[in-house]
Amino acid sequence: MIYWFTGQPGAGKTVLANALKQQLENTFHIDGDDLRDIFDNKDYSEDGRRKNIALAQHISHFLSKKGCNVVVSLVSPYKDQREEFKEKLEDLIQEIYVHTTDIRGRENFHVKDYQPPTSNYINIDTTNISVENCINKIIKL
């Protein structure tokens, strides 16, 4: 199974992804910042972002086919790219939209062209809910 955490920087994607990883067996975590470091991708244009997302999609699909659970934490702002991946994998992926109204110091990194999901996703507002409760909501679905 692939658990794809999407949302603005500072919403809690990586925190929740790490917590979910601890609850699942045979799980690999792919983080967007790590991918950028490994592949030296400092291109934050739409094209650069799309390439980083496509890379995460290919790696997560590969690992999933090998029997791993995969947890991805990545802004992944483009709805069309996420929807296409969900259509391809059908029941093998769960999109998790993480958002908050809290100010957490990463507002300068917000992606102006972020497109929230509109269908077939788990909605997690981290403003007033504990990490444990967020993870319980994800696991129960």
Question: Could you tell me what each predicted segment is?
Answer:
Residues 2:
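Walker A (P-loop) ATP-phosphate-binding motif of ABC ATPase nucleotide-binding domains
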Residues 5:
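Hydrophobic anchor at the beta1->P-loop junction of P-loop NTPases
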Residues 9:
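The conserved Walker
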Residues 14:
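Walker A/P-loop
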Residues 17-61, 65:
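Conserved substrate/cofactor phosphate-moiety recognition/catalytic segment
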Residues 46-57, 79-82, 117, 128, ...:
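Amphipathic alpha-helical transducer elements in NTP-driven molecular machines
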Residues 71-77, 88-104, 124:
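Conserved phosphate-donor/acceptor-positioning beta-strand/loop module used by diverse small-molecule
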Residues 98-141:
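Small-molecule kinase domains that catalyze NTP-dependent phosphoryl transfer to phosphate-bearing small molecules
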